[in-house]
Every structure is written in structure tokens, then in C-alpha cells.
């Protein structure tokens, strides 16, 4: 007897491909869906080979396969947001924006149109029930854990979402793929931003918004001009390489001012802080933070969680006070909160205090 119909987001990679197999083995009826997210006039970013890989896997596993176009939503909510943030002197995380608006909203809605009871992805996270609420828990494979990107999910989404890979280590996923004869078993993981295959975000923004990118001044903490920069979109807090200025000592980006078009340069000690304010905060184990809470937090995907006090400020904002100084807290990035293995929530870094 079927456990229900699952619409699986297939990327053509090994994780979503093996997810299809696991779900079938568990008794679900699986529908494979590839999201055609965006292409420019030359179709430079339309990854046809990925779509074909996904189609071949679906045929091998004997599951229905569809391609849906979510390009309009992707451009408005991810690409335009990404560009606007850089032009505003912030450093966005497009994967967080994509999960919030595309994979777990636009795709979630598309899954319902296909008659699915659930949606699934190849993300490395676990969904469990604790205290009568669905929560997100770190994956078995700590190196592949993707909970940092998932803090925006709501209860209604979690109740209908399955992430099979969270229970496996990456090497086991590849082993399963090879054992069942999937050609993608040794396919490399994508490292770049999906709509910027050459990983040159500055070049991408300049091609699309050349008139908004202009040279400006590097200044020191006192406001003294110490050089010329090629445009604020090319810089982020804590950056040392590629500045193109020689000061006789290591120089770091410590602030970006989009109003004056200036990049502020300082010493390494200037990029360490203990406090930040985050906006657009979402919590998963509960709806609202009523009082201060001791948790762990991290300010970038690759960082280790560090002890911090989370203070509610109202208007979906919190203040995060770390016990120890954190390197290069960056506006536009996400601060993500944990209670041991459980994802508590997160928000966008708005201000460094």
C-alpha cells in the first residue's frame, strides 16, 4: 500500500537521485520534478545537461518526470535580491533566499498541483517531531549538513516535507547510487552559485547593471582616502585578498558604505565583534521568542556554532551577543541559531553592534 505521493525536486545530482530511490523503497509514489529556474537571452544559465541527468535517473527508476519553469519567481526573489543586496553594500546568501521563496514555496505549491501529499529534496537535514512540533535536526553527515540554509521553514512546510539524505553519510549515498546503476554516482557536487557558473559574482552584476557599478575610494577609519576601488560589489567584510592597495601591512575590509561608495579599510582586529542585530527572524520549535535565551549561533555556513545570548527586540528582530568575538560578521548574511543538534531559527544580519 502506498504511503502517499511525493513530488521530489530533482537537480540531476546524486543526492536527489538517490532520494528518489530511497522514497520508492519506503513505499511512496514518487514524481520527479526538475525546476528550470532561469536563463538569459543566450540561455547561458539553463543547465540542460542537469535536466537530462535528472530525466535519465527518472527513467532508470521508472518514475514520472516533469520539468516546470519557475524562472519568473527565481529572478524576482533570488537574482534581483542578490544583485540589490550587493549594490547596497551587503553580502547576500542566495541559497537561503532560494530555499525560502523557491524550493519551499514555489515548488511546494507546484507539488500540490501535481496531486502530491508531500514534497522532498536531496538536502542533508533531518526532520523530527519534538514537543508536538516538527523541527529540523543536523544531518548524520556533519560535513554535508545543510541546516544553516533551512531556518525559514514553517510548520506547514515541515509537516509535508521529506529529506531522505539527512539520515545518510555522503559516501553511503554515492555507494547506493553506484550499486543501483545510476550514472550520476560519481558526479561532482556543485560548488558555485547556480546562476553564476564561473563564480564571478562581480562580473555577473556588472554585465546586468553596468550603470550602477562605479569606482570609488578606499578610506581608512578616519575617512582618509588611501586608494581607488573598482566597485563596492567586489568586496565583503573581512576580505584581504584582491584589494589592490599596498599599505605596508595587512589590510582588511571592515565596512562598506553604499551611500558614499566607499570601502573602509582597517586592521584584522577591526573585523572581530561580539554583537549583532538580525531581522526577518524565524523560529522553528516555537512561534516567538518571549525572553532571552542561551543558544549557539553561527554567522556563516562554514563556521562552528558559538555560545550566544539571543535577546528579542520585537518586529521580528533579535540581538545576538556572543561569548567570544566572531570574525567578519557581515551584513546580509544569516545568523543561524542552534540548541545542540536542533535548528532553532535564524535571521538576516542587519547591523553589527
Curated annotation (Swiss-Prot):
Catalytic activity line of the entry: S-sulfanyl-L-cysteinyl-[protein] + uridine(34) in tRNA + AH2 + ATP = 2-thiouridine(34) in tRNA + L-cysteinyl-[protein] + A + AMP + diphosphate + H(+)
Region (Interaction with tRNA): 144-146, 300-301
EC number per UniProt: 2.8.1.13
Active site (catalytic residues): 98, 194
Pfam families, A to Z: tRNA_Me_trans, tRNA_Me_trans_C, tRNA_Me_trans_M
Compartment(s) of residence: Cytoplasm
Gene Ontology MF, one: tRNA binding
Chain positions of site Interaction with tRNA: 123, 333
Binding site for ATP: 9-16, 35, 122
Name used for this protein in its record: tRNA-specific 2-thiouridylase MnmA 2
Species for this entry: Clostridium botulinum (strain Loch Maree / Type A3)
Amino acid at each position: 500500500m502506498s504511503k502517499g505521493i511525493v513530488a521530489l525536486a530533482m537537480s540531476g545530482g546524486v543526492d536527489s537521485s538517490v532520494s528518489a530511490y530511497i522514497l520508492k523503497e519506503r513505499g511512496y509514489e514518487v514524481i520527479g520534478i526538475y525546476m528550470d529556474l532561469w536563463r538569459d537571452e543566450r540561455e547561458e544559465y539553463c543547465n540542460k545537461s542537469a535536466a537530462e541527468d535528472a530525466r535519465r535517473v527518472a527513467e532508470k527508476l521508472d518514475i514520472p518526470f516533469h520539468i516546470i519553469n519557475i524562472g519568473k519567481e527565481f529572478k524576482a526573489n533570488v537574482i534581483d535580491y542578490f544583485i540589490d543586496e550587493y549594490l547596497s553594500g551587503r553580502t547576500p546568501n542566495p541559497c537561503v533566499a532560494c530555499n525560502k521563496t523557491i524550493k519551499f514555496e514555489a515548488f511546494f505549491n507546484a507539488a500540490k498541483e501535481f496531486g502530491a501529499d508531500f514534497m522532498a529534496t536531496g538536502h542533508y537535514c533531518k526532520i523530527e517531531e519534538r514537543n508536538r512540533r516538527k523541527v529540523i535536526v543536523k544531518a548524520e553527515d556533519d560535513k554535508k549538513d545543510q541546516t544553516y540554509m533551512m531556518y525559514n521553514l514553517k510548520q506547514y512546510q515541515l509537516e509535508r516535507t521529506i529529506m531522505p539524505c539527512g539520515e545518510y553519510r555522503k559516501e553511503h549515498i554515492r555507494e547506493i547510487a553506484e550499486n543501483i546503476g545510476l550514472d550520476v554516482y560519481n558526479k561532482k557536487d556543485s560548488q558555485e552559485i547556480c546562476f553564476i557558473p564561473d563564480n564571478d559574482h562581480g562580473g555577473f552584476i556588472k554585465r546586468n547593471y553596468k550603470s550602477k557599478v562605479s569606482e570609488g575610494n578606499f578610506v581608512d577609519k578616519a575617512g582618509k582616502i588611501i586608494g581607488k576601488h573598482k566597485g563596492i560589489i567586489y568586496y565583503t567584510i573581512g576580505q584581504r585578498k584582491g584589494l589592490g592597495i599596498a599599505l605596508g601591512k595587512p589590510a582588511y575590509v571592515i565596512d562598506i558604505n553604499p551611500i558614499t561608495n566607499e570601502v573602509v579599510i582597517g586592521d584584522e582586529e577591526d573585523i572581530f565583534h561580539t554583537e549583532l542585530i538580525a531581522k526577518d527572524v524565524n523560529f522553528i520549535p516555537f512561534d516567538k521568542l518571549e525572553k532571552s535565551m542561551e543558544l549557539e549561533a553561527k554567522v556563516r555556513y562554514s563556521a562552528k556554532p558559538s555560545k550566544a545570548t539571543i535577546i528579542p527586540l520585537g518586529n521580528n528582530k533579535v540581538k545576538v551577543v556572543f561569548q567570544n568575538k566572531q570574525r567578519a560578521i557581515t551584513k546580509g548574511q544569516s545568523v543561524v541559531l542552534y540548541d545542540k543538534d536542533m535548528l532553532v531559527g535564524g535571521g538576516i544580519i542587519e547591523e553589527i553592534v
